[in-house]
Amino acid sequence: MTYHEWKDLALFYSVESTQKFLEKVYILNGINDAKKNSFKNSERFIYFLKHAESFYKQAAYSPLEIKPILLFYGMAQLIKACLITRDPHYPSHTSVLAHGVTTRKRKKQNYCFSDDEVKIQRNGLCVHFMKHLFGQSDIVDERYTMKKLLMAIPELSDIFYFQQKERFMTKVEKDKNEIFVPEEVVINYKMSDSRFAEYMSHHYQWSFTKKNEHGLLFEISPQDKEPWTSTSLLFDMEKNQYYIPSQREQFLRLPEMTIHYLILYNVGMIARYETEWWYELLTQHISDDYVLIQQFLLVSEKKFPKYASQFLLHF
């Protein structure tokens, strides 16, 4: 991690500026006692960011063996900084202090990371930040496989294609509040044009505008206008390109920040507690999981702090 990658977050390293920022955000969000809460939280906010920076800096120079642990705890600190812009009393009770995610008991033989699952718990940080940052509270007890989560990271698309000769996402053209979806997506979804427009309107609040011989044009929902809040569009930060899942079953309806959290939680737990399998993977390169995990960590190390800074600076 370089200074350039953290410089937007470092803008907040002043109590005076941060107090003004938090007061403004609390007023915008209709939170009572904005001035009092901004005064109370300004130093905490900075501490969360600086602690996150320490974890990310250490991760940048650490070996792959421990990198996921450092990245996960750095990510958690960034989430807490974002959280107190929406929930000034965080943590108001101890139940929100847990990670809020569980993994199934790992089998010692024939274990496959891509098939492993995470489950979102009723209490904890995960469901709390999903509710306060993204307005989603219907994800309790949902389960996601690692493969499905990794497939939603556009920067990993070429790796999946190399390994499986299959594209899991299709390019779309975004211009401000509009998205052009090519006809091949509609065909892959096994829908008529009108049914596809109805589907996107019902599930993602997209508004159909017009159709031409190459595809359909939509006005997208406010949530999908920014990559860090979108639950339907996938954004490749390296290529500056938007995508949509190639199959409707691949929609997770999760913001990418949550996807990173779920993957990193599991990889971090493996690095901490499944030492034998972890080192076999890293030293023997026993499966395709090695490349996916390694590349995901490289992507997340840069992308998550960027999304956190964009979330904070959009106010």
Swiss-Prot record:
Lineage: Bacteria, Bacillati, Bacillota, Bacilli, Bacillales
Name of the protein in its database record: Uncharacterized protein YaaC
Name of the encoding gene: yaaC
Species this protein is from: Bacillus subtilis (strain 168)
Source superkingdom: Bacteria
